[in-house]
Amino acid sequence: MQLQQIIYNFGTNFTLKKGMLGIRYERVDPEYKTLGAYYFNNDFENITLNAAFNLLKDKLSLQTNIGRQRDNLQNQKGKQTSRWVGTVNANFQASDKLMITASYSNFTMFTNNQLNQFNNINNNPLQIQQPRDSIQYRQISQNVNININYALSATKEKAQNININYSLNDMVNKEDGIVRRGGISRFHNANINYNISFPERKMNIAASINYTNTYAASQYTNIIGPSISFNKGILKDKMQISSGASYNISSGRGIRTSVFNFRAGASYAPWEKHNFDLNIINMFRLTNQNIPHPKMNEITCTVGYNYRF
């Protein structure tokens, strides 16, 4: 006798004085068929919890979400997968000038290839190094981001702000609790940006320094360098001119490379539907790598015309 395959999907939210709590449950039985979105997606169960709160006189807002998904609900498959997903977001308005945001997310996946029980019974217990036909696989991915923005000044004549940002991406792959060679990858990025604008002059200047550290395939790579840019509107804002320069040094695996870029461009719109563009990029590269051209100077020039119908 074949049991009827059904689907469940329900949830509720509880409103609090300074926040909210919610829960949702979703289940789709194996071999459930419909003409809707679940035709190709069945045999899974989702449980999700979420919450949001406003604290410190509404200066701090917190949002969090955690959920679990699993398949193989009736143990009919040779493999079972479960996933955990969690996120936390925070926004803190410390003052009229200072804003801090932070976020964290975690994705964890477990996969178990189930053993054939008859193989376990029939295996000779004296053969200690019996080949395994089951692997417990786990993948953990974590992301962190922190952003700090501070407004130095804000007037009609001049506006200044400084921004600091840091991000991390970390991924680990495990087999039977063991991290194999190359099973870890980690990415760090940090940058500081300074921006000053003169609204009445239609002019903006920005400067930044960026640092990146990457660990992948058991190797480290570092990249660091500053950049600066300039933008201004002229001819009653019909023309926009811009220029910029950047320099970075990368090192890793015994290779060191330095790159310098200079950019200049202009955009001119003499009439409402017509636009002309001119951009020039000059790149200098120097490396100690054993390649045919360790020193390179490249110039790229593009000219464009655009008509809007």
Language model segments and positions:
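Exposed, low-structure sequence patches enriched in small/polar residues
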Residues: M1-F309
